Regions:
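Polar helix-capping/helix-linker motif
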Residues: 28, 44-47, 114, 125, ...
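Carbohydrate-active enzyme catalytic cores, enriched for enzymes
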Residues: 222-297, 301
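Generic structural signal of hydrophobic/aromatic residues within well-ordered alpha-helices
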Residues: 6, 10-13, 17, 21, ...
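Extreme N-terminal leader/anchor segments
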Residues: 1-69
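Intrinsic-disorder-associated interaction segments
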Residues: 3, 10, 14, 44-45, ...
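Long, low-complexity, highly charged intrinsically disordered regions
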Residues: 64-81
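Aromatic-lined, polymer-binding surfaces characteristic
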Residues: 80-257
Length: 304
């Protein structure tokens, strides 16, 4: 018993020390310089908001950017952690009225960039960072277009630097959901900046997620129908992004979508909860609407 407790203590001490060293490393100048090695280029591909609609829930009521306190938006220290995360992931950009002033949107983004030039454990978490990059690029009409060269350079540098960090850290994430979201962010950045390194890394990561998450019959190892729907949504999203940007679609992606699509076609017709781990009765109306939006009609869905 004494030996077991001693080993447990040593293990805990080792892991704590390792984590502390890791935190110091991420905040070091050495690491900052490492992720700052970037070849600056401009956005050449802008993903359609309709393709990303399965990823983001839009507020029906549009926000006018002029109504926000652009000068003090990053100085509010009274926000709860949840609201702070929502503010820093920039998903609220999807609810901004497109008639709003791009210059105000860009001034808010540039203030964030200046405040978060280096790694910050609160604002550079995998899920928050991934959502921020997706939102910045997807909303380029407000966040990027009609800006001067100086702004574009800072924006491009920040996006690429954050993606470099994401690539370094994503394998350490314990959440498959966060890994998949990060994978989407890396792929979108690779497509938008015509960066083959990012695109190839993102697609290779996607392949690893598929290998580790599915059994030989292409069903989630969790046996969860909800998880099946989650994966299918993201895989269809990646395929549509590749298709829209005129890039080749990997065979493994078409294959997993085909088999998940067949399962989805069966389970989506069942209204009652199924007796699998962690399953609940699902409302599939929104995803079906999305499939129709990207022209995958019901009769062809078994063949996807």
């Amino acid at each position: 018993m004494y030996l077991k407790n001693s080993l447990s203590f040593i293990n805990e001490f080792f892991n704590t020390s390792k984590n502390q060293i890791r935190k110091l490393y991420l905040k070091s100048n050495f690491y900052n310089n490492k992720i700052s090695k970037i070849e600056i280029s401009n956005i050449t591909y802008r993903p359609s908001l309709s393709i990303l609609s399965c990823l983001v829930k839009y507020d029906k009521k549009k926000i006018k950017i002029e109504e926000l306190d652009k000068d003090n938006i990053w100085e509010n220290e009274l926000l709860s952690n949840n609201n702070l995360n929502k503010l820093n992931n920039f998903y609220w950009l999807f609810s901004i009225d497109l008639k709003s002033s791009p210059s105000i949107t860009q001034s808010i983004i540039i203030k964030w960039i200046e405040k978060n030039q280096s790694y910050n454990s609160l604002t550079w978490q995998t899920d928050i960072l991934s959502k921020r990059i997706i939102s910045w690029i997807a909303n380029s009409k407000l966040s990027y277009d009609e800006s001067d060269t100086k702004y574009k350079n800072k924006f491009n540098f920040s996006v690429n630097k954050q993606i470099n960090h994401l690539i370094n850290e994503i394998s350490k994430s314990r959440s498959v959901n966060d890994k998949l979201l990060g994978c989407i962010a890396i792929i979108i950045t690779g497509l938008s900046y015509a960066n083959e390194k990012f695109l190839n890394y993102g697609l290779e990561l996607l392949k690893k997620i598929i290998i580790n998450s599915f059994d030989d019959e292409y069903f989630p190892k969790t046996r969860s129908i909800r998880q099946l729907n989650f994966y299918l949504k993201y895989f269809v999203l990646v395929r549509e992004l590749l298709k829209e940007s005129f890039n080749d679609i990997p065979e493994y992606l078409d294959e997993i979508i085909f088999y998940l699509g067949k399962s989805y076609s069966v389970f989506s017709k069942i209204e009652q909860s199924l007796l699998f781990n962690g399953n609940h009765q699902n409302d599939l109306k929104e995803f079906n609407k999305y499939l129709s939006l990207i022209h995958i009609s019901e009769p062809t869905r078994p063949y996807w």
